[in-house]
Each structure stands twice: as structure tokens, then as C-alpha cells.
Swiss-Prot record:
Occurrences of domain Guanylate cyclase (ranges): 896-1026
PANTHER family: GUANYLYL CYCLASE, RECEPTOR-TYPE GUANYLATE CYCLASE GCY-7
Stated name of the protein: Receptor-type guanylate cyclase gcy-7
Organism: Caenorhabditis elegans
Domain notes from UniProt: The protein kinase domain is predicted to be catalytically inactive.
Transmembrane region(s): 489-509
Keywords assigned: ATP-binding, Cell membrane, cGMP biosynthesis, Glycoprotein, Lyase, Membrane, Nucleotide-binding, Receptor, Signal, Transmembrane, Transmembrane helix
Function text: Guanylate cyclase involved in the production of the second messenger cGMP. Unlike other guanylate cyclases expressed in ASE neurons, may not play a role in chemotaxis responses toward salt ions in ASEL (ASE left) sensory neurons.
One Pfam family per UniProt: HNOBA
The keyword Chloroplast is assigned to this record: no
Length: 1111
């Protein structure tokens, strides 16, 4: 073949000798509306019948005209065809072009179909400014030069589009560099042009590298192997260009296989415009695989197939890659219509080679159809007069439609935006389209047709995509050293460090587990209370945070109703202890549990969490005592008792705010409880709502549902339970049940009566529970009848009734109860403690006024106050205190201590008003004080109805102290014979007296209201003598008996051995009276006589005392 540029120069010289025609506005030489179309076909070229041959493609133009008519395009116009044959020779094509324009006066030229003839035709038509549209095998890059050929159209894919498509594939699979190998055998221009196009694309984008370009001039096996060896050291992605259909690809890949360059590392990229990929079209419509020679199969076919599987192919599928499904019918119509006008090809079109339409026949159809569409646009635009003017025509030529060669898009330059295809052999060796590549100018759109990229690399290990640069480089000398070789020392160090780290981690984990286990054991010990740490209250703890019983009795306020553990005795369900905490003692209450559950890990975790629950309105759970005779749950002791106690005693004047505050505290406790891991209380009663020193309600006995046993609850304890729980016999409870119980407790507070007012009901608890289980409209509920002197918010009454509604679903949640309570007292922010203080201040003020009136004379007269002070303290002590001097404690080696107590005073006081009690005691003590003044005895204090005296201090009197106390004791008993209670004349006062001798320490205690106090075991012994004595008798210790006999004049008799609390077994005596050796002048008094006279009274009081003790 001759070069294009030499041929173009010859054509230019020929054309310049021709006269340049003058183009009129209307086509000349035509009759009517006729479009003259000139065709330049290839008839006898060797491969023409398969691709663009006249006998297998020409009728496509007629089919296109028929389509224009069906679509009402160019209506009223006819098409006249003039056909010339250039036989794919450029000089013939140039001459035919001139002949068609000058001789036949055609309006447009369709063709030629080869590169060199098309170049000649473009040059001529450009000179005459006549439209020309090429198709078929036209793909030379020179023909895409818009500046050179602005008036020509091309319906086939251009060679330049291959470079853009190759870049798109490289970018898709992340290959940044490649090698280009090209063959010039029989077709020098195509591959050289493709090289130039690739270099232009690489330079334009700059994101890929053309690492090496090699021309394979020697196509022998050795020559190919030599070229491949050069490629091996420069790349693994090998783009190859060669002439199609002569077996070069097979030969090239077999040489690569022989050179060891067929494997997972290598990818051979074949690219061609005039190709169908891995198959070669044959005459008659057949195809043969590229790995099989045209001469037939041989022994290398299997090797060739394996090599072809390491390649991919970029081509246009000869214009049939995306054709319509009716292309077969289209091809059959072409063959049939070739025998009709205007072709009348009968004899020449016979034979097996002309039974199948040419592969590019669809492009001829699309070229004629595109020309008709453009003319129709000119017609409608009123530019039909310029239809032969190529410059005017090309403005209307860009368009898009679905043609017989697929989707056709003609750009502004008059060339078609091609659709290329990426092909690969699948597992079944089929020529498979893997992707479409739509090229538009210098850009390409890659659309994969697979869902899994692995199908692209099915012949490779793990279906893995190859890389453009091997791990070891192209020459193999860049392989990274093995980790062990390069870092052997570091590996050893790392192993040692790793071993040490693992060992340390294992040790850490072990010690962490051990520490965690020990921490859990420590936390478990916090709630597991040893029984040995629970102490009964005795005198040893009184000095460590506990007052004596007598001190509490004398110091207890009726308003405060405060008690300590010392007053509490064991009940059916509770025990009271002092919990030893190191050197301190804490008062606690222990609830008995008959059921001992198995404490697994979950229950132990729950107990730890339960102990950590801390809220102002929850009583603190201290723990469980598991090693005692009975399982006990230990709780903090609240000194003011429970709400039930407050209601029962009725000593507190509760107003609206007082009731509201107690209810609010209960609600806050339940809100916290319902939101905690405990969930609900289950057995909420007024007995387990305790009140602490600050008048704050604390809910107790929660969270131990698993320890509850039905037999531990009396019928009366179930009166707070909701009806649904009673019916189900569920002692664990529910949140709704807690709300019901809350309503019952609120009713108790409002009415100031016990649960269901059982004191005034005829029914017993069992009957009430039966009615509650039965339910219905007459199911019993507490009557909310309250003292109307107290202002109760009506909304509170409604809320309480809602709480003990029969249906659980209709009861308000505890959150709802809290929000409604807030609305009832939104204006007040006082707390209950402040309220109680205000009440106490008011009470104190009234008392102060009363005392002020009664003690006016004492205030007015200083002497009387001194007298009173001397009566309260010894004169020597009082004088020192008045002078501001410190009174040092003093030890008295031998004194006699006297204790007395009015028998059955509590019963007697219950029959009197407070004022009568005061008058009674005043009258009695006045008599006693008069007796004391006659003896050398110092009155230490009165403790309620008790009397404490001592002789032998503050003035020592040798052994006379025991005589003075004995005479005073006999005088006390004697004086009771004539004492009468004014308002109870039938009642008699009787005393229980105890005395003991020993050493004591005396001193003044306190700065505010100082008191002269006695300390020593002798005092406790005297107290035990009194408490273990009998009414109307003088109980004497062995030491006092010894001293009595020492001074003489008194009669005693042995009582025998008696068990004394805190002392053990002691022998004690009765002082029966005075003997013959008494001091002269002393009145003879017999304790026996006094006792005999009061024997009946004593017997009655003893019976009453026994009844109260049993209670």
C-alpha cells in the first residue's frame, strides 16, 4: 500500500486542473423532488464479501429509504441511486468521486468503505463542498481530522477511539503502566497510528505510563521470543496491535508461552476496530476461533487456547456488538432485495459466499438513514435549498438514533461516537463481552457487564486481578527479603518480648481474676454479717453511743417519741441488736427469715447491689446474717419507729403538711425502688415505713422477695396487699401492688387510725382478706373519714382512692402519683424537720411562759435561786462553780448508795392527768425530802419516779453512812402508811428500795446544766438491788449487810442467792428493821410491820406487773 500523503498530493494536482463548478441554490438537472445519492462500493476485493462487499450490503440503502418513508421523513421526496465501484483502490475512488459529482450530479456520496479510498474521496468532495459519508472499514486517524475534512461524515469507529478505550480499561483495573508491541506486517499505518494515538492519550491525561514501545519486525518464532524477552523486563500489561485474520495473534501467544510469559502475571491486551475479538468471520456467515488456524486444527491448539485465556480484547465487534434483535431479518432482507431494483443482482450474487449479509451492512443502512434525517431537519428549517452545500448540511448532521449497527450518536464533527467492547474468554471458552466502553472525543465511559470481576480472571489463581508491576519487579531482583532473613534478630527479640508480654498478660489476667475474686469476696463480706458481731444491748455498749435505760426514760420527750434499741425487745419477726463495727456499735434491727435460699453468684451479685442502694427515703440494707440459728436480714435502726407506731401512739399532732410530707417521702422512695434493679417492694406496709431522727420516712424490708415465706406473715400483715396478689397468693408482689399498699398507708395517715380501722370493726383480719379476695362492688376499702380540723386537700383523697382501685391497670403509676403530689403543694418548699422544729418552738414557748409564771418568785429572789442551787448540787461544789472554778472529780472510798422506785407507777400515771402526776410526785418527794433533811444523806437526783441518794459524800462520815441510809430507808417506808393520793384515795403508794456500799467517784459533768454525778460499780450494784427487789422491802447487798452488822442496831435476813443481771449469782439480804443496838433517840421502825400492812397492796401490784410483762 502507498502512503496516504503521497496519494493526497497527486489528487490535489489533478483536482486543481479541473474547473471549479458553480453551485446554484436549487439542484439542477433534476425533475421534481429527487435526491440523487451516489454510492462508491467495493465489489471484488478479497475480504469485501464478509465485511463491506457490494453483493452482501448494497440493499441496506433501500431498506433505510423505506424506514424514512415509514417514519414520514422527507415526505414527497424520492431517492435516486447511482452506484460506482472503486474495488478499494484510492485512485479509482478519487475518479469515481469526480465522476459522481460532475457527470451524475449527485447530491451526496455514501462511501467509500476503506481507509485509502476514503481519504481520496474526502479530498475531492471537500474541494466540491459536496456532502460525503463514509462507512465500513474506515478507521484511519487522518480521517478524523475535522479541520482538514469539516464536510465529511463517518459512521464507523475511528482508530483514535481505541487509545481512549485502552486508557479506560487500564484505569478500571488500576494498571498505571503498560508496554506497546506492534506489528507492521502487511499494515504499517494502522499500528503506527495506534502508537501515536496512545502516546497522545498518555500525554493528554498524564495518569498512565507507556513504559516501553517495540516494533516486532521479525514475525518468526525466534524474532517474537526475542521481542518478548525485551518486554519481560519492562512490563506485564502488554498492549498489542497486529493485522487481524492472518494468525499473528496465535503465533504471538505461542511464542509468549514458549518464552515463559504466559501466566498469572501477564495480561495481553489486543485491540482492533475491524475485529470480532476471539473469532474470525468466514464467508457464508461462519466463524472460527482465533486459536485455530485457517488451515485447520493442529497439535498447538490447546497451548494456544490456554495462552488466549491470559488475554483480553478491545474491539468494535465489527459494528454488531449492540445491534437490534432483528438484525438477522435485516440481513436476510438485504440478500433478498439485491435481486430487485435498482440492483438486479442475480447471477453475480449467487453462491455460498453471498448468502449472508456483510458484517458492516448495518452501517450503510445507518449512513443513508442519518442523511435522510439531516435532510428532513433542513427541510423543516427551510434550508432545503442548501442541501447540496456540505458546510450547511453538516450543521444538521449531528443526531442520535437506534440504527442497525446499534446506538448511533453523531457528534458535532460529523463522526460517530463509537461503542467498543471489552472481551474475554469465559470458563467455557466463549467469546464473552465483559464491558462496554462508550467513547466521546477524549473521554470514555466504562460499564461492566459482570456482577463479579472474578469472571474476568477465571483462568488465574483465585480469580485474582493481575498487577502491572510484580512484587519482585520486572527482573526479579526487587523481591523483598523474607521477614526472617531481614529481621532475624528483631524476630528473636520480638519473640522474647512477645513471650514476656504473653506471660505478663497471663499473669496480669490471673492476678486480675484473683483480685476480682478477692474484691467480690470482700464485697460479699460487707453484706454477710457474722452472728458474733450482733450483740444484745447491755451496759458495756451504753458507754459507746448508747444511753442507759433510766437516762432515756428521764430524757424522753413526749413530742419526739424517740426511742433507742435499748427499749426494743424481740418480737415475732424482728430482733434488735447492736452491730459491732471495729470499736463502735451501731443499732440495727434484724428481720427473721424462716426460708434459707441457695445463694448462687447471681444472688450474691444482687445482694451487693442491694447493699449499695442509697436514697434518702430507703432504709439502708446492711446485709444478711447466715451463720446464726436463723437467717436474718439486717437493716439500719430508725429511732422514731414506723408510721404504724406514730399512728398507734397518737402523740404527734399531725397537720396537713405533716401528712403530706410523710406521703411524699414514701412516694419518693417507691419511685427510686421501682426504677432500680429491685423493681418493686412487694410487701409494703405502714410497719416497714420507718421514721428516722430527722422525721424522714425510710422504706425498709425491700428487695428480699426470695427470702419471704407465707407462714411468717400473720393475716393482719396481709391487709396491705392488693386483691390480685391475695388471690394469687403471691408474696413477691408487683409495682401495681405497691401503689395499692401506698394508698392503704395514706388512708392510715389521713384518718389517724390503723389499717382498715380494725379496732372499731366487727370483722377480723381473716374476714377482711376473704372479702378482698372476693372483690366486687362491696369489696372493703378504708374509710377516709378524718378530723376536719385538719385541712386535707380533696385532690389527695381522690388520689388515695385511685391508688387502691380494684383493677391494677386503673391504678396510677408511682410516677403519676409523684407528679400529682407536686401539684398539691407547689407553693411550699419547707421540709418536715423545719415544720417539727416550729412545732417544738411553739411548744417550748408555751412551756417557757408556764414555767416563768410558776417560778416568778425564784427569778425575783436571788437567795431562793441559791437555795435551789444548793439543793441541786452540794454547797461546796455550787460555791466553786459560782466562782468559776473547776470542780475536780473526787474518789470516796466508802459510801452507801440508795435507789428507790415507785411500784406500778406507769399504771398509776395512766390514771392521772400530767398535772396530777406532777402534784403526786411533788407531794411524795416533799415528804421524802423532809426525811432526807433529818439524816446525813445527799440527794443526787430524781429519775422520774426513781430516787437516788448517797451518804458519805460530799462530807465523809466514817462508817456512819450505812446507818444513815438504813434509817432513811425505813423512814421512807414508814411515811407511806399515811400518804394518800388526793384524786385517787383508794390507791396506795409502795416503794422498791435497794442499797449497796462501796467506793465511787463523784464529780460535776457538763458546763450547761451541770450535774453532780456518781460513777462506779457500786452505783450499778445498788441499782440492781432496787430492780431485783420486791415492793415494800429494802434489798441489801452483801457488802451493805456487812457494814450494817459492823455498825450494829439493824436486823437483816438472808434472801439467798439471786441471779443479778451483769453480776451473776449473788447472795443478798433484806433489811427488816432496827435492832437493839440502834442509835439512841432513833425511832424504832420495823420493815416487817410496814410490809405486813402493805402486803395486800403489794400482791395486787405484783399481779398487774406480771400482766404487763407478759404483754
Amino acid at each position: 500500500m502507498k502512503p496516504f500523503y503521497s496519494m493526497s498530493l497527486v489528487l490535489f494536482l489533478v483536482i486543481t486542473l479541473l474547473p471549479k463548478p458553480m453551485f446554484p441554490q436549487v439542484a439542477t438537472g433534476t425533475t421534481g423532488n429527487v435526491i440523487r445519492v451516489g454510492f462508491i462500493h467495493c465489489r471484488d476485493f478479497q475480504s469485501a464479501p464478509i465485511t463491506v462487499g457490494y453483493r452482501t450490503s448494497a440493499a441496506a440503502a433501500s431498506i433505510a429509504v423505506d424506514r424514512l418513508k415509514r417514519e414520514n421523513l422527507m415526505s414527497g421526496w424520492e431517492f435516486n441511486f447511482t452506484i460506482e465501484f472503486d474495488d478499494c483502490v484510492e485512485s479509482e475512488a478519487a475518479g469515481m468521486t469526480v465522476d459522481l459529482i460532475e457527470k451524475h450530479n449527485v447530491d451526496v456520496i455514501i462511501g467509500p468503505t476503506m481507509n485509502q479510498p476514503t481519504l481520496a474521496a474526502f479530498i475531492v468532495s471537500n474541494y466540491f463542498n459536496r456532502p460525503i459519508i463514509a462507512w465500513g472499514l474506515v478507521n484511519a486517524a487522518q480521517l478524523d481530522d475535522f479541520e482538514r475534512f469539516p464536510n465529511a461524515g463517518i459512521l464507523s469507529a475511528g482508530q483514535r477511539s481505541l487509545g481512549v478505550a485502552i486508557r479506560a480499561v487500564l484505569k478500571r483495573y488500576e494498571w498505571s503502566q503498560f508496554v506497546y508491541a506492534y506489528f507492521t506486517e502487511e499494515d504499517t499505518e494502522k499500528c503506527v497510528t495506534m502508537r501515536n494515538d496512545l502516546q497522545q492519550v498518555v500525554s493528554y491525561f498524564g495518569d498512565i505510563i507507556l513504559a516501553y514501545s517495540i516494533q516486532v519486525a521479525d514475525i518468526s518464532n525466534d524474532g517474537m521470543i526475542e521481542a518478548l524477552k525485551k518486554i519481560q523486563s519492562r512490563g506485564r500489561i502488554i498492549v498489542t496491535c497486529m493485522k487481524d485474520g492472518i494468525g499473528l495473534r496465535r503465533k504471538w501467544l505461542l511464542a509468549a508461552e514458549e518464552a515463559g510469559m504466559i501466566g498469572d502475571e501477564y495480561v495481553y491486551v489486543f485491540s482492533d476496530i475491524k475485529s470480532k475479538g476471539y473469532v474470525v468471520p468466514l464467508l457464508g456467515g461462519g466463524e472460527r476461533p482465533s486459536w485455530i488456524l485457517s488451515t485447520g486444527s493442529d497439535e498447538n491448539d490447546t497451548r494456544a487456547l490456554k495462552a488466549f485465556k491470559q488475554s483480553i480484547f478491545i474491539c468494535d465487534m465489527m459494528g454488531q456488538g449492540s445491534i437490534a434483535t432483528n438484525y438477522t431479518i435485516f440481513g436476510q432482507e438485504i440478500i433478498a432485495r439485491m435481486k430487485e431494483a435498482p440492483y438486479f443482482c442475480t447471477k453475480d450474487c449467487e453462491g455460498e459466499n453471498f448468502t449472508v449479509a456483510a458484517t458492516y451492512a448495518g452501517q450503510l443502512h445507518d449512513a443513508v438513514y442519518a442523511y435522510g434525517v439531516a435532510l428532513d431537519k433542513m427541510l423543516k428549517a427551510g434550508q432545503i435549498a442548501q442541501y447540496r452545500n456540505a458546510t450547511a448540511f453538516m450543521r444538521y448532521f449531528p443526531q442520535s438514533f437506534i440504527g442497525m449497527s446499534g446506538n448511533v450518536t453523531i457528534n458535532e464533527k460529523g463522526t460517530r461516537n463509537p461503542t467498543l467492547f471489552l472481551l474475554a474468554l469465559d470458563e467455557n471458552n466463549n467469546n464473552t463481552r465483559m464491558a462496554t466502553i462508550y467513547v466521546e472525543n477524549m473521554s470514555a465511559t466504562f460499564n461492566a457487564l459482570y456482577s463479579d470481576e472474578g469472571v474476568m480472571w477465571a483462568s488465574r489463581k483465585n480469580n485474582a486481578r493481575p498487577v502491572d508491576v510484580p512484587l519482585c519487579g520486572f527482573t526479579g531482583n526487587l523481591c523483598p527479603k523474607s521477614f526472617v532473613d531481614e529481621y532475624l534478630i528483631w524476630v528473636i527479640v520480638a519473640i522474647v518480648v512477645l513471650f514476656l508480654a504473653i506471660t505478663a498478660a497471663a499473669c496480669g489476667i490471673y492476678f486480675s481474676i484473683q483480685a476480682r475474686r478477692q474484691e467480690i469476696e470482700r464485697l460479699n463480706r460487707l453484706w454477710q454479717i457474722p452472728f458474733i458481731h450482733l450483740h444484745q444491748i447491755n451496759s458495756k455498749q451504753k458507754g459507746k453511743g448508747e444511753h442507759s435505760v433510766r437516762s432515756l426514760q428521764s430524757g424522753t420527750s413526749t413530742l419526739s417519741s424517740r426511742t433507742t434499741v435499748s427499749f426494743k425487745t424481740e418480737s415475732r419477726n424482728f430482733l434488735f441488736f447492736s452491730l459491732q463495727r471495729e470499736s463502735d456499735y451501731e443499732p440495727v434491727v434484724a428481720k427473721k427469715h424462716a426460708y434459707r435460699p441457695r445463694l448462687d453468684d447471681d444472688k450474691c451479685t444482687f445482694m451487693r447491689s442491694l447493699r449499695n442502694l442509697d436514697q434518702d427515703n430507703l432504709n439502708r440494707f446492711i446485709g444478711l446474717c447466715l451463720d446464726g440459728p436463723q437467717m436474718l436480714s439486717v437493716w439500719r435502726f430508725c429511732s422514731r419507729g414506723s408510721i404504724a407506731d406514730v399512728i398507734l401512739k397518737a402523740t404527734i399532732q399531725m397537720d396537713n403538711f405533716f401528712i403530706y410530707s410523710l406521703i411524699k417521702d414514701m412516694v419518693h422512695g417507691l419511685v427510686f425502688l421501682h426504677g432500680s434493679m429491685v423493681g418493686y417492694h412487694g410487701m409494703l406496709t405502714s410497719k416497714c415505713c420507718l421514721i428516722d431522727d430527722r422525721w424522714q420516712v425510710k422504706i425498709s424490708n425491700y428487695g428480699l422477695q426470695d427470702l419471704r415465706s407465707p407462714e411468717m406473715y400473720e393475716k393482719k400483715d396481709l391487709l396491705w396487699s392488693a386483691p390480685e396478689l391475695l388471690r394469687a397468693e403471691d408474696i413477691k408482689g408487683s409495682k401495681e401492688g405497691d401503689v395499692y399498699s401506698l394508698g392503704i398507708i395514706c388512708a392510715e395517715l389521713i384518718t389517724r387510725k390503723g389499717v382498715f380501722n380494725m379496732e372499731d370493726r366487727k370483722e377480723d383480719p381473716e374476714e377482711i382478706i376473704y372479702l378482698l379476695k372476693k372483690g366486687g362492688l362491696k369489696s372493703p376499702r378504708p374509710d377516709l373519714e378524718y378530723d376536719h380540723t385538719i385541712e386535707i386537700n380533696p385532690a389527695l383523697l381522690h388520689l388515695v382512692r385511685d391508688c387502691f382501685t380494684e383493677r391494677p391497670s386503673e391504678r396510677p403509676s408511682i410516677e403519676t402519683v409523684r407528679s400529682q403530689l407536686r401539684g398539691m403543694n407547689s407553693s411550699r418548699n419547707d421540709n418536715l424537720m423545719d415544720h417539727v422544729f416550729n412545732m417544738l418552738e411553739s411548744y417550748a414557748s408555751s412551756l417557757e411562759e408556764e414555767v416563768s409564771e410558776r417560778t416568778k418568785e425564784l427569778v425575783e429572789e436571788k437567795k431562793k435561786s441559791d437555795v435551789l442551787l444548793y439543793r441541786m448540787l452540794p454547797k461546796t461544789v455550787a460555791d466553786k462553780l459560782k466562782l468559776g472554778q473547776t470542780v475536780e472529780p473526787e474518789t470516796f472510798e466508802q459510801v452507801t448508795i440508795f435507789f428507790s422506785d415507785v411500784v406500778q407507777f406507769t399504771t398509776l400515771a395512766s390514771k392521772c392527768t400530767p398535772l396530777q402526776v406532777v402534784n403526786l410526785l411533788n407531794d411524795l418527794y416533799t415528804i421524802f425530802d423532809g426525811i432526807i433533811e433529818k439524816h446525813d444523806v445527799y440527794k443526787v437526783e430524781t429519775i422520774g419516779d426513781g430516787y437516788l441518794c448517797v451518804s458519805g459524800l460530799p462530807h465523809r462520815n466514817g462508817n456512819e453512812h450505812v446507818r444513815q441510809i438504813a434509817l432513811m430507808s425505813l423512814a421512807f417506808l414508814s411515811s407511806l402508811q399515811f400518804f394518800r393520793v388526793p384524786h385517787l384515795p383508794s390507791e396506795r403508794i409502795n416503794l422498791r428500795i435497794g442499797m449497796n456500799c462501796g467506793s465511787v467517784v463523784a464529780g460535776v459533768v457538763g458546763l450547761t446544766m451541770p450535774r453532780f454525778c456518781l460513777f462506779g460499780d457500786a452505783v450499778n450494784t445498788a441499782s440492781r438491788m432496787e430492780s431485783n427487789g420486791k415492793p415494800g422491802k429494802i434489798h441489801v447487798s452483801a457488802e451493805a449487810n456487812r457494814m450494817l452488822h459492823l455498825v450494829g442496831g439493824f436486823d437483816t435476813e438472808s434472801r439467798g442467792e439471786v441471779i443479778i443481771k451483769g453480776k451473776g449469782v449473788m447472795e443478798t439480804f433484806w433489811l427488816t428493821g432496827q435492832g437493839t443496838g440502834a442509835v439512841s433517840g432513833a425511832r424504832h421502825v420495823s420493815a416487817k410491820k410496814v410490809s405486813k400492812k402493805m402486803d395486800e397492796i403489794h400482791r395486787q401490784e405484783t399481779l398487774k406487773s406480771d400482766e404487763q410483762l407478759s404483754d
